[in-house]
Regions:
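Sec-dependent N-terminal signal peptides
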Residues: 2-11
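Secreted/periplasmic proteins
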Residues: 13-107
Length: 107
């Protein structure tokens, strides 16, 4: 029973890398058709469906943010799982960090 529980927990919270995007995309249409707001708590993901709410936890400091998937991107080729809005990223790390290791959970 314990092994099964560990497998289930591991499948719902895996280590990933997140970056952020902002300024040049602010006000432009996202892949979902809504306008990008760099201050909203949203993110781009090629794995999760539009509208999925994710809890993103910075592994280095434990800070977290809940964001909603509303965009896609070409960031996967750089080893990045999520591209957070500027507002969401600022909740978990200074923008100057640029890229952070995170845990991701659906909520």
């Amino acid at each position: 029973k314990i092994i099964l529980l560990l497998i289930l927990v591991a499948s719902h919270a895996q280590a990933h890398t997140a970056t952020w995007y902002g300024g040049q995309f602010h006000g432009k249409l996202t892949a979902s058709g809504e306008r990008y707001n760099q201050n909203a708590f949203t993110c781009a993901s090629n794995k999760y469906k539009f509208g999925t709410r994710l809890k993103v936890i910075n592994k280095a400091n434990g800070k977290s943010v809940i964001c909603r998937v509303n965009d896609r991107g070409g960031f996967g080729k750089y080893g990045t799982t999520l591209d957070l809005s500027k507002g969401a990223f600022k909740k978990i790390a200074p923008l100057s960090d640029g890229k952070v290791r995170v845990m991701i959970r659906r909520v």
